[in-house]
């Protein structure tokens, strides 16, 4: 089983990110589960969502404490939470940022992981460029597919289009493809 924890803030599409990830996995014939963890928080408050992917039925229902991958949609959370808590040795880290890991103050931890398992991509900028809104979730889904190899881009494309129709879907797919290509090139 591959387990993903997504950290962000309310309004960034954290819950939708896990839903689209699980849809993409399902479209590839896998079993998947997506669920959020939040209370009555408002826009801007920290939110966590989870996704499990496996080739067999998933019976677990609890939050993911030991993820194989973490996606950080908002790097300001580094000061508020230990977003890396429980990350599996050799796990994957995808961060929405154009800043260096040194500037973010996380390079020492990330140096303990395989270099090809760690990447930052300016997903918010890609979302603004392609969708016109600062919601990085679809772009980060493209980056996730590239860094982990767990999903094919065609499944990511289909999952995004299932969630968002028309021009919004097209823009989100374009942002996801740009992130996918940026992560592959990194």
Kindly give the residue locations of the regions a language model identified:
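Active-site cofactor/cluster-binding pocket
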Residues: 1-186
């Amino acid at each position: 089983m591959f387990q993903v924890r997504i950290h962000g803030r309310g309004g960034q599409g954290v819950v939708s990110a896990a839903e689209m990830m699980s849809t993409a996995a399902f479209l590839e014939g896998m079993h998947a589960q997506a669920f959020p963890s939040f209370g009555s928080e408002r826009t801007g408050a920290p939110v966590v969502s989870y996704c499990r992917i496996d080739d067999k039925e998933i019976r677990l229902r609890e939050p993911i404490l030991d993820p194989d991958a973490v996606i950080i949609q908002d790097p300001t959370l580094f000061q508020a939470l230990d977003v890396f808590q429980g990350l599996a040795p050799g796990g994957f880290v995808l961060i929405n940022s154009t800043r260096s890991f040194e500037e973010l103050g996380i390079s020492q931890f990330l140096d303990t992981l395989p270099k090809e398992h760690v990447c930052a991509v300016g997903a918010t900028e890609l979302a603004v460029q392609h969708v016109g809104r600062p919601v990085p979730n679809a772009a980060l889904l493209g980056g996730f597919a590239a860094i982990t190899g767990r999903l094919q881009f065609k499944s990511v494309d289909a999952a995004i289009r299932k969630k968002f129709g028309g021009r919004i879907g097209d823009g989100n797919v374009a942002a996801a493809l740009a992130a996918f290509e940026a992560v592959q090139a990194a």
